[in-house]
Amino acid sequence: MTEAEKIEVRDITRIERIGAHSHIRGLGLDDVLEARAVSQGMVGQKDARRAAGVVVQMVREGKIAGRCILLAGEPSTGKTAIAVGMAQALGTETPFTSMSGSEIYSLEMSKTEALSQALRKSIGVRIKEETEIIEGEVVEIQIERPATGTGQKVGKVTLKTTEMETNYDLGNKIIECFMKEKIQAGDVITIDKASGKVNKLGRSFTRARDYDATGAQTRFVQCPEGELQKRKEVVHTVTLHEIDVINSRTHGFLALFSGDTGEIKQEVRDQINNKVLEWREEGKAEINPGVLFIDEVHMLDIECFSYLNRALESDMAPVVVMATNRGITRIRGTNYRSPHGIPIDLLDRMIIIRTVPYSEKEVKEILKIRCEEEDCVMHPDALTILTRIATDTSLRYAIQLITTANLVCRRRKATEVNTEDVKKVYSLFLDENRSSKILKEYQDDYMFSEITEKEEDFGIGGGSKRRLDIGAGDAEAMEH
């Protein structure tokens, strides 16, 4: 074999990130909003999924806005999974913004501004406009360049459809667009007359035999029918936040790319609201209320809850879905306790969807789906042991053991994860219960001891007791 024949071909590996909820494709409901047992990556939680399906249906119809839904349940019961399923079910047309309750705390902008931006990111505006386009197959292009090499270029293009053929004179700007898109004879193109934008749709089927080999990106399309000049309705979908950023004088549209939007004045927002409502009255635009999902909502403080009370009553408000795993706990920023750490007046505006713990059978099904998602072949006995670990500890811990067990399996050059692999990673990585047990056993060896309830009420820790042992003389000196 000669040197020229020794060619090594390597396939380019496509990197796909596998997230905690990347296996979810929707809510797993049928046409009458009944939950299937296992569908679209969702398992169990039939009542919660059915309730979420009703909310999705209402959002699709666009009839409701400013409603608030709370997903409440114990940890590892699929609250975030239901929210991800809602986002997948709504599709890309409906704005869906996801954020955590702790994301609003920043030194650059106020808490209410962060919430306001999140709310306006969740409201879409469909703007309709009619444009005049020229659509046809390129028969011939002639471009005349100046002899000196500098100056304006002029040219002609011949376009045809199945019914007609016409010549067009080209200006310098259109010629540059043609050269940028690499337009040649046989291409099917569209030219926007208003903006001068040239779009290449593909190659004509009549030119399919021009080349013996073509790249994968080459697309063959039919020659257009009818007139060359057509009127076409174009729909642009933008969010209110994007319109805010573009109209904010301090930053302008470049802030859309940098992400550094800063605080936007309320006057700008009011003007945009009035303009969008005016467009809606004229039939130029449609308002599409989306969904704002706030995870760990108990991390918001009393000022944020007060702001949400007013924001939810606005006409320009999306459907807000919140999730929390807290029971009766303290409202952040106050000394009062309430259910889920949310004030009673805001709870009164919510409808609450409860999630229940998964059964052992459902946990096994979830682990099986995660094994498929992570390309891990697991023996049935190993899956049974992993299910038992999940019921004794937590579902998240068991899911994390799948990847580590798969790595141990590959280390011994096997293709199937067995019980020994699962036992090995279980002994290597501690769960929360075993870790707490070790900490209680060896807590005196650690730097700080456990804080008792009495110490917590006084706001002191184990290492602060010595500071309270003030002598009588010191106390008198402090009084004077």
Curated annotation (Swiss-Prot):
Function, as annotated: Acts as a transcriptional coactivator in Wg signaling caused by altered arm signaling. Pont and rept interfere antagonistically with nuclear arm signaling function, and are required to enhance or reduce arm activity, respectively. Also an essential cofactor for the normal function of Myc; required for cellular proliferation and growth.
Record keywords, A-Z: ATP-binding, Chromatin regulator, DNA damage, DNA repair, Helicase, Hydrolase, Nucleotide-binding, Nucleus, Repressor, Transcription, Transcription regulation
SUPFAM superfamilies: P-loop containing nucleoside triphosphate hydrolases
GO cellular component: NuA4 histone acetyltransferase complex; nucleus
Enzyme class: hydrolase
Catalytic reaction annotation: ATP + H2O = ADP + phosphate + H(+)
Protein's cellular compartments: Nucleus
Main localization (coarse): nucleus
Assigned EC number: 3.6.4.12
Entry's family note: Belongs to the RuvB family.
Protein name: RuvB-like helicase 2
Organism, scientific name: Drosophila pseudoobscura pseudoobscura (Fruit fly)
UniProt: ATP binding residues: 73-80
Record GO terms (molecular function): ATP binding; ATP hydrolysis activity; ATP-dependent activity, acting on DNA; helicase activity; transcription corepressor activity
